Design a protein with these regions (language model features):
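Flavin (primarily FAD) cofactor-binding/catalytic cores of flavoenzymes
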Residues: 1-18, 22-24, 53-341
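A short small-residue
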Residues: 43-47, 306-308
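A short acidic, helix-capping loop that chelates divalent metal ions and anchors anionic groups
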Residues: 47-53
Length: 341
C-alpha cells in the first residue's frame, strides 16, 4: 500500500509495533516455509530473489520484506504500537493512540491482517496443569516443548508441518483433527500458478461463483494442505488422531475414543480476528468490517488490507495482495485529489 500511495504522490506514514517489517515472519517457527513458490511470492515491483520453484523460508521472506521497504523508501515508524483507533469528534478524521502518543490522520489504512490473535479452544482449560501448552505462534523449535509425547491439535498445513518436524526430531507425536483436503503434489509442482489464477480471476466478488463462495470461505476456516500431506506424517513416524473431544482425568480425549498421555499440547488451531481496538467500528454478522474492496462502507477515510475475500479468494495470499493494495491506494488518492502515477 505504501508503494502504491507513493506512486500516486500521496503523503503518508507507516506505523508498526515491531522493529522491522519482516519481524512478523521471523517470529514464526524456524523451519516454516511458504506454500507458494518464489515466483508467486513476490510483491509488485520486486521479484523474490530465488529460483522460480523454490519455497522460501519464513525468515527469508521476512528479509525480503525488509529489503522491499528499503527499496521503495517506505516512511516507516517502527516500535510504534497502535493501542486504539477512533474517529475524531467531527467524524472528519481519526486518532490513533500509540505508545509514542496520539497520531491524527484524515485517512487510515488498517493493514494488520485478518486474524492476528491465537485461537486456543476452551478445552485447554481442562487439561492437567502438568501438561505444557503452546500455540504455534509462540513455537520456534522442538526444544521449546518439554521431553515426552506431544499432541498437535490441528490438521491444517501448519499442524502437519509441525507434526512432521517434531516426529523427525525423535518425539512421540500425535496430530489430531478432522481430515483436511489437500492439493495433490502434481498440482503443487506443475499447476499451482493456474490454481492461484483461478482464485485471483474467477473466485472474485465480481463473479456469481465468487459471490456465492464468500460466506463459505469466511466461515469455513483454513484451506487445503499444500506441499505436504498426511502421508508425510506417517513417513516421519507421527500418528494421526481424530478431533479432540474433551478431556478425561485431565488428559486429551479424542473422538475416536483414545485418551492420550502427553507431556505437551501444541495448538495449531489458527487465529481469530478482533477489531474491538477500533472504537465503535460497525461490523457484519461475522464480526468483520463492512467494506467494498477494502473501503469502509460506514466511515469515510477508513480502509483495510488483508481481509478474507477482500475482493478475491487470492486476497489473503502474497500473490493477490498487490491488486487489493492498488485499488485501495487509488481510491485514497482520488479522495485526496492526488493523481500522480
Amino acid at each position: 500500500v505504501s508503494r502504491e500511495l507513493a506512486l500516486h504522490g500521496v503523503e503518508h506514514a507507516v506505523v508498526d509495533g515491531r522493529a522491522a517489517p519482516g519481524d512478523v515472519w521471523r517470529d514464526r517457527w524456524d523451519t516454516l516455509r511458504l506454500f507458494t513458490p518464489a515466483h508467486l511470492s513476490s510483491l509488485p515491483g520486486m521479484p523474490f530473489p530465488a529460483p522460480r520453484r523454490y519455497l522460501p523460508r519464513g525468515s527469508e521472506f521476512g528479509g525480503y520484506l525488509d529489503e522491499y521497504a528499503e527499496r521503495f523508501n517506505v516512511p516507516l515508524h517502527p516500535h510504534t504500537h497502535v493501542r486504539g483507533l477512533k474517529r475524531t469528534a467531527t467524524g472528519a478524521g481519526f486518532t490513533a493512540e500509540t505508545d509514542e502518543g496520539a497520531w491524527l490522520a484524515r485517512r487510515v489504512v488498517v493493514a494488520t491482517g485478518f486474524a492476528t490473535h491465537p485461537r486456543i479452544p476452551t478445552i485447554g482449560q481442562d487439561l492437567d496443569p502438568s501438561i505444557a501448552q503452546l500455540h504455534s505462534s509462540a513455537y520456534h523449535r522442538p526444544t521449546d516443548l518439554p521431553e515426552g509425547p506431544v499432541l498437535v491439535v490441528g490438521c491444517g498445513t501448519s499442524g502437519v508441518q509441525l507434526g512432521v518436524e517434531l516426529a523427525r526430531s525423535g518425539r512421540d507425536v500425535t496430530v489430531a483433527g478432522k481430515p483436511t483436503p489437500r492439493v495433490p503434489r502434481v498440482v503443487s509442482d506443475h499447476a499451482f500458478g493456474l490454481l492461484l489464477a483461478i482464485f485471483h480471476h474467477v473466485f472474485t466478488r465480481a463473479t456469481p461463483i465468487g459471490r456465492g463462495s464468500v460466506r463459505d470461505v469466511i466461515r469455513g476456516g483454513g484451506g487445503p494442505l499444500i506441499g505436504i500431506s498426511p502421508e508425510d506424517l506417517m513417513a516421519a513416524g507421527a500418528a494421526r488422531g481424530a478431533r479432540l473431544a474433551g478431556t478425561r482425568d485431565g488428559q486429551p480425549d479424542l473422538e475416536d475414543g483414545r485418551v492420550l498421555t502427553v507431556s505437551s499440547v501444541l495448538w495449531a488451531t489458527g487465529f481469530r480476528h478482533d477489531f474491538t481496538w477500533i472504537q465503535d467500528l460497525p461490523v457484519d454478522e461475522d464480526g468483520l468490517p463492512r467494506h467494498t474492496r477494502g473501503m469502509s462502507e460506514d466511515w469515510a477515510g477508513l480502509s483495510f488490507m488483508g481481509l478474507p475475500f477482500q475482493f478475491a479468494l487470492s486476497s489473503m495470499t502474497i500473490y493477490g495482495v498487490g491488486r487489493d493494495a492498488a485499488y485501495v491506494a487509488a481510491a485514497l488518492a482520488r479522495s485526496t485529489g492526488a493523481s500522480a502515477r
